[in-house]
Amino acid sequence: MLLDDQLKYWVLLPISIVMVLTGVLKQYIMTLITGSSANEAQPRVKLTEWQYLQWAQLLIGNGGNLSSDAFAAKKEFLVKDLTEERHLAKAKQQDGSQAGEVPNPFNDPSMSNAMMNMAKGNMASFIPQTIIMWWVNHFFAGFILMQLPFPLTAKFKEMLQTGIICQDLDVRWVSSISWYFISVLGLNPVYNLIGLNDQDMGIQAGIGGPQGPQGPPQSQVDKAMHAMANDLTIIQHETCLDNVEQRVLKQYM
């Protein structure tokens, strides 16, 4: 079967360009409606807590790339810092409860902002996708756009040939509405290429923007710090830099 060359200019390219431009426009809209609240979702003390826990995890996982002296210095600093809870947020909540207690999520402003941003993100994702799906179904229904260059099993026929009623058609042929779904699920690398982050786009989850790193619950942060300090204390350090000069000379001489 041969396809008209004009299909890629009048069907394939318009759908692809509209999908990319819609994603870019949605990013700017989400920045306008959730930009200020998203940046205030995590207070600085919470970010500091999370960053020190992440630092300890990275040291445990990648300590073999450091020399013994460097690892020992970082280990001593982190163990002392985590044990003494220097960066633990101990401020009281607005309702008077201690930070170590489990907070009421309905009284947490950051939780309310996160839920509102999620609702805005869902709307900003659902409405454009619904409009574009109607546009593709109305103007490009029944078109076969391309043939994939690799073989597929018959189970992909229903996914790739939506709107095409032809049992004998090879499974590799792709319809217009199927190309729309493929674009929705596979445009994240394109957004990364043009400078839009996956988390900022929120294509799959429908969220409005970055909410900051999510660490352990407030009631468990102190326990997590002590557990991480204990792990750092008992870890056996094996560096890949021991006798590296002799190993390099032995390999190349």
From Swiss-Prot:
Molecular function terms from GO: protein-folding chaperone binding
Pfam families, per database record: EMC3_TMCO1 (PF01956)
Cellular compartments per GO CC: EMC complex
Example of a GO biological process term: phospholipid metabolic process
Subcellular location: Endoplasmic reticulum membrane
Bilayer topology: Multi-pass membrane protein
Task of the protein: Part of the endoplasmic reticulum membrane protein complex (EMC) that enables the energy-independent insertion into endoplasmic reticulum membranes of newly synthesized membrane proteins. Preferentially accommodates proteins with transmembrane domains that are weakly hydrophobic or contain destabilizing features such as charged and aromatic residues. Involved in the cotranslational insertion of multi-pass membrane proteins in which stop-transfer membrane-anchor sequences become ER membrane spanning helices.
Protein name in UniProt: ER membrane protein complex subunit 3
Source species of the chain: Saccharomyces cerevisiae (strain ATCC 204508 / S288c)
UniProt lineage: Eukaryota, Fungi, Dikarya, Ascomycota, Saccharomycotina
